[in-house]
Amino acid sequence: MPELPEVEVVRRGVAAHVVGRTVSEVEVLHPRSVRRHVPGPDDFATRLAGRCLTAARRRGKYMWLELGGGPEEVDAGEAVLAHLGMSGQLLVQPDEAPDETHLRVRFRFDDGGPQLRFVDQRTFGGLSLTELVSVDGVAVPEPVAHIAPDPLEPVFDLEAAVARMRKRRTGVKRALLDQTLVSGIGNIYADEALWRAKLHWARPTANLTRPQARTLLVAAVEVMQAALTAGGTSFDDLYVNVNGESGYFDRSLAVYGQAGLPCPRCGTPVRRDAFMNRSSYSCPRCQPTPRNPHY
């Protein structure tokens, strides 16, 4: 699933190519891709026609397109919320480009320029039209209101996140993946941040010192910024930017997906452990198992 850096790459592409344009038509080719829009596909398409996409924003793994224009009775505080799921893609394509095999939703614009296409092989992702609400002075889609700011947001409070993490009674990786604590971090960047901070994934959060928790969250910021510079992490063609190009941060991963290969820091073979129906990767020497692990 795309994590913060991948979604931010897509957001920047959408902002560059789509923001400021007015929707002329929306074509929903697969109703499952707008299943979270309860009034249904026809309502989704009808309410977007004539609306201007005024901004592209993101929190964690969610991005949204703020809307302006439309009839006077339309609430201006609305947005198209996008969640990419496992395989969702937002592509900017010229009108004459052939339809992708898994094209689900198409946006056409009144300037006759490139389309915005939502492509999703597994249909776990989706789009919905939702109201914006204010959370601590920031306008976010109502379905996203419960998640915490992510580490790349200006409103992210590092010291507050450190304090919240140390109050949890859980394992440190579980805490990193908890989107109500810090949003945007998934399996890949959690493992990479833990490696950089030299912490085992099952270390109890209650046993973290304040400097350790701070070091870990700073490591998460640093690794995600590095991934963003590299265009994100692509293991297959399911994650691409708006131009259909893959990221290349997978070449820089220290431990994630590197089981049996030498740790870049000490040379010890990287270990893979089962974790929450997925995997955790760590260096047994740099990240020793704690005395009282929280699995």
From Swiss-Prot:
List of catalytic residues: 2 (schiff-base intermediate with dna), 3 (proton donor), 61 (proton donor), 278 (proton donor)
Reaction equations catalysed: Hydrolysis of DNA containing ring-opened 7-methylguanine residues, releasing 2,6-diamino-4-hydroxy-5-(N-methyl)formamidopyrimidine; 2'-deoxyribonucleotide-(2'-deoxyribose 5'-phosphate)-2'-deoxyribonucleotide-DNA = a 3'-end 2'-deoxyribonucleotide-(2,3-dehydro-2,3-deoxyribose 5'-phosphate)-DNA + a 5'-end 5'-phospho-2'-deoxyribonucleoside-DNA + H(+)
Co-factor binding comment: Binds 1 zinc ion per subunit.
Enzyme Commission number: 3.2.2.23, 4.2.99.18
This protein's record includes keyword Zinc: yes
Residues given in the record as DNA binding sites: 102, 122, 168
GO annotation terms (biological process): base-excision repair
Cysteine pairs bridged by disulfides in the record: none
Function description: Involved in base excision repair of DNA damaged by oxidation or by mutagenic agents. Acts as a DNA glycosylase that recognizes and removes damaged bases. Has a preference for oxidized purines, such as 7,8-dihydro-8-oxoguanine (8-oxoG). Has AP (apurinic/apyrimidinic) lyase activity and introduces nicks in the DNA strand. Cleaves the DNA backbone by beta-delta elimination to generate a single-strand break at the site of the removed base with both 3'- and 5'-phosphates.
Name under which the protein is recorded: Formamidopyrimidine-DNA glycosylase
Gene assigned in the entry: mutM
